[in-house]
Structures are given as C-alpha cells and as structure tokens.
C-alpha cells in the first residue's frame, strides 16, 4: 500500500481511524457536517496534533521538513479565504513544481488573489496543490463554490493526475453522486469515525437520512 494509517485520533473530533490507500487510487470521504472528514485529513497532514501512525511510501510524512513535504503530500483546506496580496501566479509558485494545465487560469495569473472571485480563488489553490505533483493529495471540498461544469472538470482532472501514476488522493466531498462517479472507494464518516465503506447498505439511511430511489437520492420517508 502507498498510504497506511492506523489509530488516528484527535480529541473530540476523530476516533481511532485506520485506512489504506493504493497507488493510483482516489478515495472519497463523505459524511454529514461535523462527521470527521476534515479532521481525518488534518490527522494525516499532521495538523492539530493527535495520535496515531501514518506511513506514506515508507516514511511518516508528518515528520518531513518544509522542503520535502510538498513532494510527499499537499493539503487543500476547505476555506478559500486568501488575505495575502499576492499575484495568482506567485501563490501557485509557492507550492513548488511547474504549471498546471486544465484549470483555465491564464486570465487571472497576473491578478491579486484577494481580488478574485471565490471560484477563481478555489481554482488557484487547487493549482497550487497540484503543482508539485505530490505522492498524496489531501483535498477538502475541492469542488466547493465551483459551478456544476467546473465541478465535473475538476474531478476529471484529479482522476487524470492519478492515472498510471504512483500517486493517490483523499477527497472530502459532500456530493454523493460525484463520489460514486469518480471514486475508486468511498469511506463514510459519522461521529468522528470511519463508519462504513461504500454507499450500499442501511448505513446510508441511518447516517444521511436518504436513500436511492430510481437512481436519485431522496429523503427516507418510512
């Protein structure tokens, strides 16, 4: 396995989470608000302390120095707030690596990021996360504030970044249909725990209060 994590816990937020991810795999994390998706990404990235073991290609990525870390993993936070008066191209360059195609950023590269729309800022931050071509992408709601077309384009881009590569991605996402469409595996989180794998079974109704009827998610009525 490329990534192996065990016993990850953050006080009050994450309880004894363990998972493995293979090279080339895109794993989506789904769950209600506050279920622990962001906390799991934090634990893997070494944000906020906590306990547990993480091994990425034989090393603990949380112990890497600032020069080594971007090649091992990058973390995209859910927040798109960017107070720094940097040009978009300079912010992307801070991530290291080269440019990223497929995000249509040419028109905004010479604009300050604090003047961009939320969707544009999101695409700039995604470009920064992808630029160093890390082994592991930790992406928290990467499709947030993007229009439906861009949501599709972005998830397809992430898939193409992993294709045939010794790289992997964990993506926290609220859209269950998108998770089913693009993920190799889906981990369902609830109350700070990895509660189940996949979206087939009674746990979906219990955790989300929805069920699939004629191919569409609908509230449970019975």
PLM features per residue range, with description:
Residues 60-74, 79:
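ABC ATPase NBD coupling module
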């Amino acid at each position: 396995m490329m990534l192996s994590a065990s016993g990850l816990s953050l006080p009050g937020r994450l309880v004894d989470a363990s998972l493995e991810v293979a090279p080339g795999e895109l794993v989506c994390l789904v769950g209600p608000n506050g279920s622990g998706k962001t906390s799991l990404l934090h634990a893997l990235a070494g944000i906020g302390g906590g306990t547990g073991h993480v091994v990425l290609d034989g090393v603990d990525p949380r112990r890497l120095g600032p020069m080594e870390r971007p090649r091992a993993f990058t973390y995209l936070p859910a927040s798109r707030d960017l107070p720094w008066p940097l040009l978009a191209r300079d912010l992307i360059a801070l991530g290291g690596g080269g440019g990223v195609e497929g995000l249509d950023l040419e028109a905004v590269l010479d604009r300050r990021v604090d003047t961009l729309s939320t969707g544009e800022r999101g695409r700039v931050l995604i470009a920064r996360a992808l630029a160093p071509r890390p082994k592991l992408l930790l992406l928290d709601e990467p499709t947030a504030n993007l229009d439906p077309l861009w949501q599709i384009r972005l998830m397809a881009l992430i898939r193409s970044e992993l294709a045939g590569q010794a790289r992997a991605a964990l993506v926290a996402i609220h859209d269950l249909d998108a998770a089913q469409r693009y993920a190799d595996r889906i981990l369902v989180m609830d109350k700070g725990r990895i509660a189940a794998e996949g979206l087939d079974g009674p746990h979906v109704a219990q955790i989300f209060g929805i069920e699939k009827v004629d191919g569409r998610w609908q509230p449970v009525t019975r």
